[in-house]
Amino acid sequence: MIKIIGAGLAGSEAAYYLANKGYKVKLYEMRPKKNTPAHVTKNFAELVCSNSFRSNDPLNAVGLLKVEMTHFNSLILEAANIHKVPAGSSLAVDRNLFSEYVTEKIKSHENIEVIHEEVTSLDPNEYTIIAAGPLASDLLSKQIQDHLHLESLNFFDAVAPIIDAKSINMDIAYLKSRYDKDEAAYINCPMNKQEYLEFYKALMTAESVAPKDFENNVFEGCMPVEDMGKRGIDTLRFGPLKPVGLTKPNGEKPYAVVQLRQDDVNKTMYNMVGFQTHMKWGDQKRVIQMIPGLENAEILRYGVIHKNTYLESPKHLNNAFQVRDIPKWFFAGQISGVEGYIESAASGLNVAINLHNLLTKGEIRPLPVDTMMGAMARYISNYHQYFVPMNANFGLFDQIEAHKTVRKQMYYDRSMHALKEYIEGGI
């Protein structure tokens, strides 16, 4: 029997893979008996931040990661492709239909027993995958800290508001994907210089909610928009509000652009791209309604701040996501030091493959470092002076000296060759 803690992206992926291999799995999920500050449903694999799984281009790092995962029959990608919504060259999903699908597949599997309880004690002698996500409970966090002799596990993260599509003024906003690449999948709210400066001033003077022990420890992928703005007046214009490739229908080039991405199949909800925030709700409404096209915006879900949890993994995990001092324990998902939805799911798949190898062959065959899955495992297990959670990127690979376009194709080819050899060697 294998114990898995957490039915998020990583835990669901690991449970499904192992159950399909014939193992009996006990999957612990404390929701809905005990909720978290960010989750709003009782479903597994709930997406609490964006609804985007990012690029589908296999010559993009996260696109390559998706290709690798399909070789292992990823449940998360299966669900995502069934319940995708238009997003240009990216993969985005209807978050509710997506998580409902994952939940049904897990709950209906004959080898998976779902237990809705908070895990408050851990046994070093049980095969355990800890995939409690970035919102692990205090009691579980304390158990992890005690067994691994840690001082801390916590940092804080923020999520973006969702807008009612009917309240968006399409006389001002317009549909377009950057550089007109693929279908016009984003709603764009353009600003001229004066509008941007007024918006920026309001953003910088908005009041934020922060817990007393907030340490301002955030990573780039989900940094609150107001914190990013504090880096400089033009930081947002070169980040989430960059206008390049988003020329207005009349040919005019905007000074800055706020993008909104479809959040559901019915196109009733749009989330604000890169607009994670922990502003107080009154200020959120005031600042958002200063954006041209959103002057009458109805906010369906306000941005919120919530606690995240992750290990300083290189001190504790090897490249199989296995705890060095407690070999029956594995960590997966954001708690293991990966960043991003697909990365979390991939780590769950990685752990499941490693545990299966350990139980059937008596040893682990880590995925090759020429694959993105293997490169990420190497990252979380190798020494870094300042370890931070990391998403998929080609910088994790052993570098190839070639022109950028050619280099990406070579990375892809090398990964597929390494993966083919790995699978042929027996999983």
UniProtKB/Swiss-Prot annotation:
GO terms for molecular function: flavin adenine dinucleotide binding; tRNA (uracil(54)-C5)-methyltransferase activity, 5,10-methylenetetrahydrofolate-dependent. It is found in: Cytoplasm. GO terms for biological process: tRNA methylation; tRNA wobble uridine modification. Pfam families: GIDA. Its EC number is 2.1.1.74. NCBIfam families: gid_trmFO (TIGR00137), PRK05335.1 (NF003739). This is Methylenetetrahydrofolate--tRNA-(uracil-5-)-methyltransferase TrmFO. It comes from Acholeplasma laidlawii (strain PG-8A). The gene is trmFO.
